[in-house]
Regions:
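Hydrophobic pocket/interface hotspot
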Residues: 19, 29, 53-55, 71, ...
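A conserved amphipathic terminal alpha-helix motif
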Residues: 114-147
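Intrinsic-disorder/low-complexity, polar/charged segments enriched in Ser/Thr/Lys/Arg/Asp/Glu/Gln
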Residues: 3-9, 16, 40, 52, ...
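A solvent-exposed, acidic/Ser-Thr-rich amphipathic alpha-helical stretch
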Residues: 35-51, 55
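Hydrophobic-ligand binding "helix-grip"
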Residues: 30, 44, 58-103, 113
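A generic structural motif
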Residues: 14, 24, 50, 76-77
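Ser/Thr-centric signal marking residues that sit
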Residues: 24, 106-109
Length: 147
């Protein structure tokens, strides 16, 4: 990618259909779309191009963390591209979730595209990799439980 993008790659020991379901169904999103120990409330989930999504997460300090965006592109079992704001910490980014079947496994390439290189560097210093790492660990656990 470029100097504005953070890329995270994960391989899930599950079919692309199952990973897609876990990624796109609100009842599953509520189980994994937050760091460990935090429950996600799916407030809005209009899964179509132009549709909005909004998830709320109560933080241990009593504040509420809001994740929201709008779907830009959806290609079933292949990719989901969305605008995204993670308030109060990160705003004005694009997230690209790219799924690839590899035998009985699914490879995920997750790109976080920032408006500037400086913003990307700031987000890395704030621990963005640890946050998403925890989220994808929870997704992996959910997929294994469903499977």
């Amino acid at each position: 990618m470029d100097n504005k993008t953070i890329t995270i790659k994960r391989t899930f020991n599950a079919s692309i259909n199952l990973v897609w379901e876990a990624w796109t169904q609100p009842q599953h999103i509520a189980e994994w779309w937050s760091p460990k120990g935090i429950k996600t409330k799916v407030v809005e989930h209009d899964f179509k191009v132009g549709g909005k999504w909004k998830y709320l997460m109560p933080m241990p300090n009593g504040q509420e963390f809001t994740a929201e965006g709008r779907y830009i592109e959806i290609v079933e079992f292949e990719k989901i591209i969305s605008s995204a704001n993670f308030k109060p910490m990160t705003e004005g980014i694009e997230i690209q979730s790219i799924f690839k079947k590899n035998g009985n496994k699914t490879e995920l390439t997750f790109n976080i595209v920032h408006p500037t290189e400086e913003y990307r560097i700031q987000q890395e210093k704030m621990g963005i990799m640890n946050g998403w790492g925890s989220v994808f660990d929870r997704l992996d656990t959910l997929i294994n439980n469903i499977n």
